[in-house]
From Swiss-Prot:
The keyword Endoplasmic reticulum does not apply. One of its GO terms (molecular function) is DNA binding. This is Transcription elongation factor GreA. SUPFAM superfamilies: FKBP-like, GreA transcript cleavage protein, N-terminal domain. The lineage of its organism: Bacteria, Pseudomonadati, Pseudomonadota, Alphaproteobacteria, Hyphomicrobiales. It comes from Rhizobium leguminosarum bv. viciae.
Length: 158
């Protein structure tokens, strides 16, 4: 059975855009660079040729990865999500029980995670600790700097 990859609609669109760019813009650019480098003669010592071939390999690998991800994507409509329990797509406001610093995270798919933007992967330790909890609950997360305790202040959707 094919393992589905949970994703927000925005994350799915970003993957599709990257796939389109790599196929329709980057691939032809690299092919042109290879042809240009090949025209310079001896390929054994042609750094431009080898760099272009390496870029082609990287691009084709990423295209394969993106095709696989978009095929397995399970796009979850966050506008239809509700409830008090935390699950995929939830925006969660937490307070650090030691420092009283507030943080807000949205739980997203692995491919969409960006901690600086407040999006954490569903497979991250903090997201795993949050799943199934609700406002008022406390969680403990083992972080690289030691254990952290948070209280859940708010859960929202969309």
């Amino acid at each position: 059975m094919v393992e589905k990859v949970p994703m927000t609609p925005g994350g799915f669109v970003k993957l599709q855009e990257e796939l389109r760019w790599r196929q329709q813009e980057e691939r032809p650019r690299i092919i042109e660079a290879i042809a240009e480098a090949r025209a310079h003669g001896d390929l054994s010592e042609n750094a431009e040729y080898h760099a272009a071939k390496e870029a082609q390999s990287h691009n084709e690998g990423r295209i394969s990865e993106l095709e696989d991800l978009t095929a397995r994507a399970e796009v979850i409509d966050l506008t239809k999500m509700s409830g008090d329990k935390i699950k995929f797509g939830a925006k969660v406001k937490l307070i650090d029980e030691d420092t009283e610093e507030e943080k807000t995270y949205q739980i997203v798919g692995d491919q969409e995670a960006d901690v600086k933007a407040g999006r954490i992967s569903i497979s991250s330790p903090i997201a795993r600790a949050l799943i199934g909890k609700e406002v008022g609950d406390s969680i403990e997360v083992n972080a690289p700097g030691g254990s952290k305790a948070y209280e859940i202040l708010q859960v929202s959707w969309g």
